[in-house]
Regions:
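Acidic, low-complexity mobile loops and tails
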Residues: 1-7
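Conserved donor sugar-nucleotide recognition element shared by glycan-biosynthetic enzymes
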Residues: 10
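C-terminal catalytic/motor cores of large multi-domain enzyme assemblies
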Residues: 4, 13, 17-24, 36, ...
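Catalytic-site-adjacent helices and loops of nucleotide signaling machinery
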Residues: 30-31
C-alpha cells in the first residue's frame, strides 16, 4: 500500500488542528495506542520540521558583521500576535502558489446611495461602512464561483472541499498586530447588520476580547488599506482559504463613458488566489462579476 493512502487514527479535532498548519497528518507517527495521533504529536512534528529546515540551511548567507558594528541600535520584542501569526504566514506563502489580479470597480452609485442613508426615526445620517457593501458583493460572487469558497485539504488525492457556508474574514489592524475574525453567515444578513458586526468584531480584536475560534473556519478574507492609502498590493492568502481580496483607498477619476468624461468613484481591487485550483481566466471572471455587483445595479444585485 502506498504511503499516501495510509490513514493514521486521529480525532476530527486533531485532523483539523493539523490542517490549520498545512500538515498532512498521515505523515505523523502517533504516540498513542495503535499509532493514534494526539495534539502533542502534531506540535512535535512541527518542531522537528522547523529544526530539520534550519539544519538544511547550510548555504544560508549570514551577516558578516553585527548591526551594532555600524552604529547605535535598539532591540525590541516582536508583539505576541505577530509571533503567533508568523508560522501561518510563512506556511501560506511557501505552500500556496500565489497570483494577484489587479482591477478597478466603479462604485459611484453605491457610494452616492450609502452617503444618502438616514435614520428613519432621527433623520441623522447613517454611518454604514462601505466595507459592508463589499462583503455582501463578495458573497454574491462566491455563490457563482464556488471554487473561491473552497479549501485544498487532500491535494495528493485530488480532492477539494467546497464550503456551503459564507463566513467572510475581515483583516483588522490593531495595536497588537493584524487579526482576522469572521463575519458568519453573511448571506443571511442585510447591509446594516453586517456593518454593525464589522464594528463589533473590530472592537473585540482591539480589546483582545474575542474567542480564538472566530479566527478560523472562513470562506474568503477581505483586507483593506482604505483608511491608510495606496492603491494596489499583493495580499497573502489566509490558509486554508484559496483567495483573498485586497481593497485600497477610493479614488476620484475621470472615466470615459459613451465618449464623454465623468468624474467617478473608483475602488482599487487586488485579488490573490491559489493557482493550484483557480486559473487566471476564472479569477478575471470573478473580478468582473464582483465589479458588476458593486456597480450601478448594486441595489438589485445585493438586495439592498
Amino acid at each position: 500500500m502506498s504511503d499516501k493512502k495510509i490513514k493514521v487514527p486521529a480525532s476530527p479535532k486533531i485532523r483539523k488542528f493539523a490542517r490549520e498548519f498545512g500538515i498532512n497528518i498521515n505523515k505523523i507517527v502517533g504516540s498513542e495506542r495503535k499509532g493514534r495521533v494526539i495534539e502533542s504529536d502534531v506540535k512535535n512534528f512541527i518542531t522537528n520540521q522547523l529544526n530539520k529546515d534550519s539544519s538544511l540551511n547550510e548555504n544560508k548567507i549570514n551577516n558578516e558583521f553585527a548591526h551594532s558594528d555600524f552604529g547605535e541600535i535598539e532591540l525590541k520584542d516582536i508583539p505576541r500576535i505577530k509571533k503567533l501569526a508568523a508560522p501561518y504566514l510563512v506556511n501560506s506563502w511557501t505552500t500556496i502558489p500565489h497570483v494577484t489580479n489587479h482591477d478597478e470597480a466603479d462604485i459611484t452609485e453605491m457610494e452616492d446611495f450609502r452617503n444618502s442613508l438616514t435614520d428613519i426615526y432621527t433623520g441623522e445620517k447613517k454611518k454604514i461602512s462601505p466595507l459592508a457593501f463589499i462583503v455582501k458583493a463578495l458573497v454574491a460572487s462566491l455563490k457563482k464561483f464556488p471554487n473561491f469558497n473552497s479549501s485544498i485539504d487532500d491535494i495528493e488525492n485530488g480532492k477539494i472541499t467546497l464550503k456551503k457556508y459564507f463566513h467572510i474574514g475581515i483583516a483588522v489592524d490593531t495595536p497588537h498586530g493584524l487579526m482576522v475574525p469572521k463575519i458568519r453567515n453573511v448571506n443571511n444578513k442585510n447591509i446594516n447588520h453586517i456593518s454593525n458586526e464589522l464594528k463589533k468584531v473590530s472592537e473585540q480584536c482591539k480589546n483582545l476580547k474575542i474567542n480564538k475560534k472566530e479566527f478560523f473556519g472562513g470562506s474568503m478574507t477581505i483586507t483593506s488599506l482604505g483608511g491608510i492609502g495606496g492603491s494596489f498590493f499583493t495580499p497573502i492568502i489566509n490558509y486554508p482559504e484559496v483567495a483573498i481580496l485586497g481593497i485600497a483607498r477610493l479614488e476620484k477619476k475621470q472615466i470615459s463613458i459613451n465618449n464623454k468624461f465623468y468624474l467617478r468613484t473608483i475602488l482599487p481591487l487586488s485579488l490573490s488566489y491559489d493557482h493550484r485550483i483557480i486559473d487566471g481566466a476564472e479569477a478575471a471572471r470573478f473580478n468582473n462579476d464582483l465589479k458588476e455587483n458593486l456597480g450601478k445595479n448594486f441595489a438589485y444585485k445585493l438586495a439592498v
